[in-house]
Each structure stands twice: as structure tokens, then as C-alpha cells.
């Protein structure tokens, strides 16, 4: 009873019905007030007998007790209509849910399959997998078959597994990672040709260059931007190749000092004379018989032992 009165719309309908019924009994002037009084008694949980007693005490003995019977019949009809509307709404929601679920399943079953990356036809979709997706039913059996086909497609031990496709994303991520290098504490005054830390741009004036980014500049030591804030190689790094070095020389400073490899292809500092290995100079070899004494042209002295 209380739930019905608290439901929006039903309490107003019951109030209007009570007011019309009281007007039929000849209490039209006080019908609105009596309807409010009846709703208060209903909200307090009064029974049919208790409502009759209250109205008889309020109106008098001429009160028609059939009103209470009509009142509870009206309440019963409103409750039935309310339950019917709730059931219809729940059925509509259930139908919408079932339709949505079936639509999602159909979309999943007819989804576009992944293409296989192959050297001979990189832009041609996998027609076999497309045919499998379209021929699979939408029931439980179809879902099991679809799951089985997906497992076979991504099974590394299967013959049709595309190894290059699974490896390429990881390699691509490794190549796209930015190289971060810490800043050299000597900045543009660094004298190490093989310094691995970041330095200011060589185009800036001495002491004015700044490194505000942990990325290395693509131009390297050839950077011409005075306001470049990326990292650069050491100012002592040799970037121009000596004339006697071949064009196949690798433009990276050699880590060995001095370098003793005559075929070394790395760059060596210009101030070092060990650009290429040279054998030590051969000195004139003299025999022991041709060696001279410490004092040349000295007279021989005879020492006679004393007796």
C-alpha cells in the first residue's frame, strides 16, 4: 500500500478517483479535503474497517460504508496496472538486451580478419581466414571453431604462423626509442675526443651553449644552429678525415690510445701521431768487436803490484 502511494503518478490518480467518488455521494464541496484525509489513513496502514469507523465519526451515520469497499477495489486495480507496466518494461529491456547481444555476436563473427604480411603481396588480405570467418555459425559451436582457428593462427609451431609479423612490432619499438645521453660536466671545454656524454652546440659562442634536452642532435658536430639545445659530440672529436685516410673510414673516435692496428678504420685524434701504425726505426747494428771504449785515445797504464 505504502509503495503504491510513494510511486509517482499513482497517488495522484488515486486522489482524483477518490475525489470523484465522494462527489458522486454528494460531498463535492469537501471532496478534496476528504480525499487527502483518506490518503493519510492509507499511508498510515489503516484497514478497511478502521477507515469506515474514522469516516463515520467524521461525517456521521449517513456515511455510505460501500465507499471503503470501492476504495480498496480501486487500489487493487491500480496495483495490477502497476505490476503489468513493470513487467512490460522488464520484457522490453530483456528484448533490447537480447537484440544487442545478438548484434554484437554477429559483428564479432563477421569481423575483418588480420592481413598476413608477405613479401610477394604485402597489401593482399588473407582470403582463407576471411572465408573461415564468414562460414562460422554464431552459436556456441561457432565460437569454439572460431577460437580454435585463432589459436592455430597465432601458434608459433604451426606451419602458417607469420613469424615476421610478430617480430616486427618489437623491432620497430626498439628503433623508435630516443637515445638519451647524460650531460658532460666540462660542456664546451671538454678535451676528450672519445667522450660519450652530451655537449653544447659548436655553433654557439664559448660558454653560452646550453643543453636542455637529453636527446642527441642529428647534425652532430656539424650543427649550425646557435640556439640548439640538444646534445652534441665533444668539441675535441675529429669530424674531418685526414687526407691519407680512405673514404671507408668509420667517423667514430677510436677507443685505443695509442692505436696499434694498421688497418683500423676508426678516427684518431689529430694531435696524436699514432694515426697509423708504423714499425720502429731500425738503428745501425754494430758487433761487439767494433764497440769503442768509454774514453777514446787514452794511454795504457801499467799497474805493478807492490812487494
UniProtKB/Swiss-Prot annotation:
Zinc finger annotations (C3H1-type) as residue ranges? 178-202, 217-232, 254-268
Q: What is its main location?
A: nucleus
Extract the Gene3D superfamilies matched here: 4.10.1000.40, Nuclear abundant poly(A) RNA-bind protein 2, N-terminal domain
Q: Which GO terms describe its molecular function?
A: poly(A) binding; pre-mRNA binding; zinc ion binding
Query: In the UniProt record, which is one GO cellular component term?
Result: nucleus
Q: What is the top-level taxon of the source organism?
A: Eukaryota
Name the InterPro entries for this protein.
Nab2/ZC3H14, Nab2/ZC3H14_N_sf, Nab2_Znf4
Signal peptide as annotated in the record: none
Region feature Disordered, mapped onto this chain: 102-135, 274-307
Q: Bias regions of kind Polar residues — which residues?
A: 105-129
Indicate where this protein resides in the cell: Nucleus
Q: Keywords in alphabetical order, please.
A: Metal-binding, Nucleus, Repeat, Zinc, Zinc-finger
Q: Which GO terms describe its biological process?
A: nuclear mRNA surveillance; regulation of mRNA stability
What does the function comment of this entry state? RNA-binding protein involved in RNA processing. Acts as a regulator of mRNA stability: binds to mRNAs and pre-mRNAs, preventing their degradation. Involved in the biogenesis of circular RNAs (circRNAs) which are produced by back-splicing circularization of pre-mRNAs.
Family assignment from sequence similarity? Belongs to the ZC3H14 family.
This protein is called: Nuclear polyadenylated RNA-binding protein nab2
Recite the lineage of the species: Eukaryota, Fungi, Dikarya, Ascomycota, Taphrinomycotina
